[in-house]
């Protein structure tokens, strides 16, 4: 990888490889969602989808001082993890109207920050709809399908609601890695709760299958090279 040495950071004593490896993507991308979200102290945040990146965005929102963190998720095991990482309220999109429920939770105002962590057009539209005027939609999902991503015109304030849309790619660099490791060293967050499956290197193919097909209620798969 070109420039890989620019991302080298010393892993502090006491931090396991399993903990540290989360800095490479999930932790950095999820926290970026909170950072780009301009979350005010005591602000309201909705994190749409509680996969690994969304869970770290939830943790990041709590660390940034959000007063109310709303997690949107339908899978019970991920709802439980969302609670662990800082979601105050869970909204199950399979059972209730997400937009209506979030407006109810925020007194009809909408949230200061909506973090889109799935990468789907419908989720992005929901993020725009639940964000208050002057708020921020922070996008950390990967939109790998479809020709367009649609902005709902009315909820966008017909272009006049001053809703900021922020996007980004997993940030790296030595200083970034050192900051993330400091968060882990001081036990601000424990990403290993997301590790649902462990495989030896000899079973790499099965590890990829479980991860790709989301088998056995998987969240994150760890492959060990200790053989």
Stretch-by-stretch model annotation:
Residues 1-3:
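A structural motif shared across PLP-dependent enzymes of the aminotransferase-like
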Residues 7-96, 100:
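Mid-domain Rossmann-like dinucleotide-binding core that forms the NAD(H)/NADP(H) cofactor-binding site
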Residues 19, 46-50, 71-72, 91, ...:
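Glycine- and other small-residue-rich loops at beta-strand/loop junctions that grip anionic moieties
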Residues 25, 73-74, 93-97, 118-119, ...:
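Short beta->alpha linker loops
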Residues 36-42, 63-64, 76, 80-164, ...:
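Glycine-rich cofactor phosphate-binding loops and adjacent beta1-alpha1 units
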Residues 66-67, 110-112, 188-193:
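A local structural motif
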Residues 125-129, 173-227:
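C-terminal hydrophobic helical "lid"/dimerization subdomain
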Residues 136, 151-193:
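Rossmann-fold dehydrogenase core element
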């Amino acid at each position: 990888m070109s420039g890989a040495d620019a991302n080298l950071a010393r892993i502090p004593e006491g931090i396991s490889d399993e903990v540290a490896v989360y800095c490479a993507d999930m932790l950095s991308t999820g926290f970026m969602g909170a950072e780009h979200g301009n979350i005010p102290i005591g602000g309201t945040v909705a994190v749409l989808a509680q996969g690994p990146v969304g869970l770290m965005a939830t943790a990041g929102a709590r660390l940034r001082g959000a007063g109310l963190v709303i997690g949107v998720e339908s899978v019970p095991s991920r709802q439980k993890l969302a609670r662990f990482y800082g979601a105050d309220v869970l909204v199950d999109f399979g059972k209730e109207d997400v937009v209506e429920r979030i407006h109810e939770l925020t007194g009809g105002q909408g949230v200061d920050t909506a973090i889109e962590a799935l990468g789907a057009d419908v989720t992005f539209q929901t993020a725009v709809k639940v964000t208050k005027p002057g708020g921020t939609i922070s996008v950390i999902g990967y939109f790998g399908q479809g020709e367009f991503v649609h902005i709902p015109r009315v909820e966008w304030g017909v272009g006049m609601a001053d809703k900021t849309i922020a996007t980004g790619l997993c940030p790296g660099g030595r200083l970034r890695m050192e900051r993330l490791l400091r968060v882990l060293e001081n036990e601000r967050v424990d990403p290993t709760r997301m590790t649902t499956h462990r495989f030896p290197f000899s079973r790499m193919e099965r590890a990829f299958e479980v991860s790709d097909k989301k088998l056995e209620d998987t969240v994150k798969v760890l492959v060990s090279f200790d053989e």
